[in-house]
């Protein structure tokens, strides 16, 4: 007799198989597609999280998972790297121009907002790709376009804020 005990979503279900003994032999759900290569192949990678469908056991592990997401975005997403380097350049310029702490904080927050939205965009694109696979769906396009639009609007706002806070001191240096 087989039964499925859903945890939070179909992809995070625990599958139990009760044999003649009546004891449940729990097996874990299959790993997400594209993350695991058979170990027999050279250069095979182990999954980042063996039990990815489980909640992190402690806060340190949660931080490690979060940092893995940031590292993944930095390694794979060109736009995330551009936003990161731009943010560092803006904060460096603000420090060199001796801007007030509140101005530096506003610049840091707007830069971080763009990077946060880029992380959310990457996550949403991954989930949409996992859901629709290689097929085209108009709703998938809308979801991806809206997420990219959110990043675009945040980037435009960051440029405006950066211009308002950095241009006056830069212009005063040129005069």
UniProtKB/Swiss-Prot annotation:
The active site is at residue 118. The chain crosses the membrane at residues 55-75, 96-116, 151-171. Its EC number is 2.7.1.107. PANTHER family: DIACYLGLYCEROL KINASE. Belongs to the bacterial diacylglycerol kinase family. It is a multi-pass membrane protein. One of its GO terms (molecular function) is metal ion binding. Coiled coil: none annotated. GO terms for cellular component: plasma membrane. A divalent metal cation binds at residue 125. This is Diacylglycerol kinase. It comes from Synechocystis sp. (strain ATCC 27184 / PCC 6803 / Kazusa). Its main location: membrane. The keyword Transmembrane helix applies.
